[in-house]
């Protein structure tokens, strides 16, 4: 059945307009981008097949344009459009966190960490330094590790905070495995980092763990 023959409340575009993009599944969002499906399949079916065969979503979207264009249902034009859309999203988040921008939306900060770190094949620990009005000073990838972890040194974060005259920091790191649940080591280093920053009166605002799906916020879970 063609999507136009679906009940109105089940159509992806109508659902997006009525309830917002966040309420749609990965397949529904991808279907809106595709616009139409392959012969004999509507856009949602085509999107589901793409995700089932070439997903999950992160792996699909991390592919370079040359790989995307060879996937059924995409082709050159859609592969280029999808890559451009992802880059626009990255630049939109970067603009919101540019130097001097006030950080009042932790969700946007988490998304920015995700955009910067998620595709790394190895673990990376990054810090966003803020002034006393929570304006961005600098985003820095301070520690790089292996697929299994990155060694984090709180004293280096403290040194950079003092150099930049930061009043607060947001930190984040990726889990290359895609598992976004914080490990005991993540919990331990967060507490060590918080204690070290407290000594110089710099606030640890949040720690994001980046994997598949939405970033996990330590602050949101009351772990700080």
Swiss-Prot record:
Entry-linked PROSITE patterns: MPN, UPF0758
Motif JAMM motif, residue range(s) on this chain: 173-186
GO biological process: proteolysis
Signal peptide coordinates: none
Pfam families found in the cross-reference section: RadC, UPF0758_N
Cystine crosslinks: none
Molecular function GO labels: metal ion binding; metallopeptidase activity
InterPro entries, sorted: MPN, RadC_JAB, RuvA_2-like, UPF0758, UPF0758_CS, UPF0758_N
Recorded family membership: Belongs to the UPF0758 family.
UniProt-recorded name of the protein: UPF0758 protein PD_0117
Species name: Xylella fastidiosa (strain Temecula1 / ATCC 700964)
């Amino acid at each position: 059945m063609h999507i136009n023959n679906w009940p109105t409340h089940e159509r992806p575009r109508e659902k997006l307009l009525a309830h917002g993009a966040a309420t749609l599944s990965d397949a529904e969002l991808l279907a809106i981008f595709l616009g139409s499906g392959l012969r004999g399949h509507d856009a949602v079916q085509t999107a589901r097949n793409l995700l089932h065969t070439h997903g999950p979503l992160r792996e699909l979207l991390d592919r370079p344009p040359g790989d995307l264009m060879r996937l059924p249902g995409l082709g050159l034009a859609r592969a280029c459009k999808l890559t451009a859309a992802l880059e626009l999203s990255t630049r939109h988040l970067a603009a919101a966190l540019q130097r001097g921008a006030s950080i009042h939306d932790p969700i946007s900060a988490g998304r920015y960490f995700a955009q910067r770190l998620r595709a790394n094949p190895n673990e990376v620990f990054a810090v966003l330094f803020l002034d006393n009005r929570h304006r961005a000073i600098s985003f820095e990838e301070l520690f790089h590790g292996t697929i299994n972890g990155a060694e984090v040194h709180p004293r280096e974060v403290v040194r950079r905070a003092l150099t930049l005259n930061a009043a607060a920091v947001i930190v984040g790191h990726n889990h290359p495995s895609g598992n976004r649940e914080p490990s005991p080591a993540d919990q331990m280093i967060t507490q060590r980092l918080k204690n070290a920053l407290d000594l110089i009166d710099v606030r640890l605002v949040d720690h994001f763990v980046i994997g598949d799906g939405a970033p996990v916020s330590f602050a949101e879970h009351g772990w700080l």
